[in-house]
From Swiss-Prot:
Every DH domain range: 372-560
Resulting phenotype, P159A: Abolishes binding to DBNL
Zinc finger (FYVE-type): 729-789
Quaternary structure annotation from Swiss-Prot or TrEMBL: Interacts with DBNL/ABP1 and CTTN. Binds CDC42. May interact with CCPG1.
Protein name stated in the entry: FYVE, RhoGEF and PH domain-containing protein 1
Pfam families: FYVE (PF01363), PH (PF00169), RhoGEF (PF00621)
Organism encoding this protein: Mus musculus (Mouse)
Segments forming domain PH: 589-688, 820-920
Single GO MF descriptor: guanyl-nucleotide exchange factor activity
Amino acid sequence: MHGHRVPGGPGPSDPERSAANTPGAAPLACADSDPGALEPGLPVSRGSGTALGGPLDPQFVGPSDASLGAPPSSRVLPCGPSPQHHRALRFSYHLEGSQPRPGLHQGNRILVKSLSLDPGQSLEPHPEGPQRLRSDPGPPTEIPGPRPSPLKRAPGPKPQVPPKPSYLQMPRVLPPPEPIPPPPSRPLPADPRVAKGLVPRAEASTSSAAVSSLIEKFEREPVIVASDRPAPGPCPVPPEPAMLPQPPPQPTGSQLPEGEASRCLFLLAPGPRDGEKVPNRDSGIDSISSPSNSEETCFVSDDGPPIHSLCPGPPALASMPVALADPHRPGSQEVDSDLEEEEEEEEEEKEREIPVPPMERQESVELTVQQKVFHIANELLQTEKAYVSRLHLLDQVFCARLLEEARNRSSFPADVVHGIFSNICSIYCFHQQFLLPELEKRMEEWDRYPRIGDILQKLAPFLKMYGEYVKNFDRAVELVNTWTERSTQFKVIIHEVQKEEACGNLTLQHHMLEPVQRIPRYELLLKDYLLKLPHGSPDSKDAQKSLELIATAAEHSNAAIRKMERMHKLLKVYELLGGEEDIVSPTKELIKEGHILKLSAKNGTTQDRYLILFNDRLLYCVPRLRLLGQKFSVRARIDVDGMELKESSNLNMPRTFLVSGKQRSLELQARTEEEKKDWVQAINSTLLKHEQTLETFKLLNSTNRDDEDTPPNSPNVDLGKRAPTPIREKEVTMCMRCQEPFNSITKRRHHCKACGHVVCGKCSEFRARLIYDNNRSNRVCTDCYVALHGAPGSSPACSQHTPQRRRSILEKQASVAAENSVICSFLHYMEKGGKGWHKAWFVVPENEPLVLYIYGAPQDVKAQRSLPLIGFEVGPPEAGERPDRRHVFKITQSHLSWYFSPETEELQRRWMAVLGRAGRGDTFCPGPTLSEDKEMEETPVAASGATAEPPEASQTRDKT
């Protein structure tokens, strides 16, 4: 691989200097302009000879061993004209001798470093052979005979080099050293750049180094090439490092080690001319001639005096100021900037240390309080001016232009404009003619009357007019959006006004919002004004009164907003119901609405329903299967007057509650506990408000009742006047009147609409008009018909219900027995020798604690059988019996055995304790009432009428 030069490469002196500055490299051989002259006396490694592949390099050659004795002074750099325009410099490294040559020693190879430099247009090409480093020994000898042909290289432009620079041909006069400014008041920190700029010296080695190590050295060393001033005569080659005289110590205090001058790059700058400013070394600003960080390309000046010199001159260099040209210097700017910041901080500290006279401090505090009050009053005035300009824009620009268009061309109705701007004209007149002039006059007379409370107190009541505007705001914004899409002319006028400078690039809706925000702004400013007023100010009383009036106006606006929101909610509900109910009324308020589950009165299944609670009524709605329009249909309307709320605690039906009203009773179930809590709280608060309203107007329930129509022996005066709570059909196994067991074919179940009991068809043959159902005729049982209308004279069914009939000992209603019981719950039971388990409702009454009653359902009026408990022993089943249910225990007496299986282990423990004490004949003492939640599968539901059950019917007493 042959060494080649890039077109426009530099003269031979440039690579020579680069090689001289490389650690461990020997100086380059530099010949005169004569191409055939070899420089004697240069040290080389073993062997001598000429370069292969062409004639000897006219400027850089590998000298023979015989030339080592020549004195160093005989080495002269070539001279020639110097170009002044240089652009960029690139290095390339090539290996020669890559092909085997016969008869030559193949152990050593030549590393060629070619240097290219862009010359000016006036330079002529100068062919030149490959350059060889002085540290490379070169070929041993030249063998006579035919030479091997050189390697072919890629076609390209012919390598050219410029002639030698003039400063290398004649000696140059070094400029005097530049003056150094005096040192700062305090010592400077150590310059971190000195340590990094110095490269440790390495002795020249006669042994050949590896090619890779040489390449790494050249790549690490930045070479800076710059034009210099032309100087006549040749430039002598610098002597060996050991022969250089030691430079005197520099004023900055940094000492260069011995022999390091030839290995460092120096930045030489001419001294200051007349009238020029001496450069400041502490400025921290790098020179424009600082070397580039790139290792292959360095930019130099196009014209003017040279800035850099690569030739570390002879002893004259020691007397010049030097600077290390390390491109990776640590932040010198940061060091200098830190010094400047510290000086500024010292000056600020000195200023703070200046004491302030105490009288001046006291006066400044007093002025600050007065200024704060004045600034708040002035802020009120300035914001009022800006606000009046916005009102002028709304009333005199937007509204006026739209009204003109509506009246002249009828592009849109004028009522639309009035609906949008409402009473903005009155608001504008109030602020523009009254409030703003008063504030301006007062601020002009602030020195004599420093107060604004009296003005606001006088005019604050008129701020209530904002309530109408605020209430209409949502509708106004909706009208603007609607007619902007519907009417082109409406849209054009709005956009034209919005483009004006007075509009401030804001939309009409933004300006319409400002009156809504103005009253809260008055309130905030006045509160701040009161806080800043000094104690005992004469304006405190008026300002406090003004704040109360403004707060009243704000509350008036808030009330208008709430009223408007309520009306919107009513309209939405009205649309949900398809206009079926007349609910849009100023006195009606929507409290709560939402989905909920309703438990069926027949079998207890859940059904999805929708409840809407108002302040005077509860609407019970069912969903409609329609995609558009009406979504719900009203099934029942329950008045709040006479409504009762009962919370249920059934374990199998959690989150349930009972709403009982005059028109209907509903057993409802929420999906979550939080939902149940919200509904119960909303209904209770509605009932409480309704009672307070009745007390306020002194409306008594007794005045609206017709007690004369009710028989005196009626067990319940509300029979027929309010809807009963129906009992579920599966909670009853027999007719609650005749006690006949039900049958799905011959004995079907029916509900009495007056009391809610489950009766058979024979016991519900009568019909009566009920007040709660708008006096419509409904099926009622015999007892309710007698209570409402008296006993019929000739009724066949009446003879079957004679009151003189003797009652059985088992005719004890289960719900009444459970109300006053020791323990009761559902149990699975089996007698000894039985074929399977049966489920029944077991009750131990409080008045008969030694008897166990067995019912078919919790609402049966007659027990199926009873079992005396004295003498029974309670215990777990025997090992050989192995029942197929969990939590099994048994009671035994002689040859009689009963097996019981409760649902939970806790319930098993309680039953065993109660039955064990009853079997021993122990008497029970009254104990605390325990909830039936853990053992009851279904809660007995109270029935209104003759057998109405109190709310605590779902609780039992465990006297263990």
